[in-house]
Amino acid sequence: LIRLQCYEGLDTATSVYEWNFAAQMLAMRDGAGEADIYAEKYLIKRALLQAVEPHASGPPVLLIDEIDRTDAPFEAFLLEALSDFQVTVPELGVIKAQDPPIVILTSNRTREVHDALKRRCFYHWVDFPDFDRDMEILTARLPESKLALSLVFVAFIQQLRKEDMFKLPGLV
């Protein structure tokens, strides 16, 4: 699993690659005869580059978590990268996936994801658990909790989820 955690301000430098500037500077300072400071050994591979590289075990799974937290320009870049399953590192060229990754996008619906991106995905809504499932989750996470308190707590959470709230509560 390769995970790309999305956040506001995410860009290609933090999602595809960065150059190890310190190592490049040391190589130049040492004069070790390194002609190319943009060699792959100075490349820090981020999630999207890792996802398009060959993997001996077959196509990797790329989790792009909370895509709704990014901005429109990054979403447009991502749309292009996922349509061709390739990324470009200007100093090294185009790196194209031999086996396209299996991509999973998650969203908390803090904003609408662009239609062009949604058209390229299978959409599956995961609703909040019912009372019994919430109880299973709570007792699995807190087996030492008292049953009476757990019942009251889960009932309270279930009631809150019926209210008109911007963000509904979970149990995490």
Question: Where does each model-flagged region fall?
Answer:
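C-terminal regulatory/interaction module of P-loop NTP-utilizing enzymes
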Residues: 1-172
